[in-house]
Amino acid sequence: ERATARMKDPGDGGADGQQLSQHRWKGARSIGLAHQLNQQFIELCCEPSLDGASGHPFPVVASYRDLWSELDPRARQRLSLFPFVIVDLRFGDVAWWRMVATNGTHARSHVNGAAPTARWDWLALETLMFGWQVAREDRSVASMIFAMPPSVADCIAALTTRQVRTLAIESAKSLRLRWDNHPRLWRELL
C-alpha cells in the first residue's frame, strides 16, 4: 500500500510520469529566452540587404549567403531552437572582459567591418543584458548557455546596468555567430 501511495503521489515525479522531476536544471527557464535571442539573430543574418558585397560582419554568413537566404520561417525557427545562445559577444575572451572590468566600459572592438544598422546595437544590448542576468543568477548556467568562463561571468555580473548599456552599444561590432570559425558546421546545419 505504501508503494502504491508513492507511485500515485504527483509531487515526486514518480512512476506515473505526469510530473517533471523536482530537480529541474536551474537554467531551464532561460532556454526560451535563448531561443528568442537566436531567432532575432537568425532573422538579421537572413536579411537579403546584408550580402557579401556590402561587407557582412559575419564571414560564415556571407560565405553561405544563398543557404541563409533560402531558409523559410519554419527552418529559421528550427535553427533557433538550440538550448544555448548562438550569438557571441566575446564571452570566451577572458582578457578582453578583464580589460573592460579594469578600464571601465570604454573598451573598443577590434573587429573589422561596420555594424550595418542600429538593430545590431539592440541585439548586442539584448545579448549582454541576458548574459548579465544569467551570470548574476548562476555562473554555471552562464557557462552552459553562453560558453562563458567563470572569470568572464564574474566580470559581467559585476557590471552596473549603465555599464551594460554603454558596453553593449560600444561593442556591437564584436557580435558574431558562435562557431563562426567552423564554416562546415554551419553549412551542414543550414
Residue ranges with predicted function:
Residues 102-105, 109-113, 126-130, 138:
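Membrane-targeting and insertion segments and their boundary/processing signals
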Residues 79, 85-86, 169-190:
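Long, compositionally biased
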Residues 74, 141, 163, 184-185:
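Exposed alpha-helical structural elements
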Residues 1, 6-109:
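Structure-specific DNA junction-binding interface
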Residues 114-120:
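Surface-exposed beta-loop interaction hotspot
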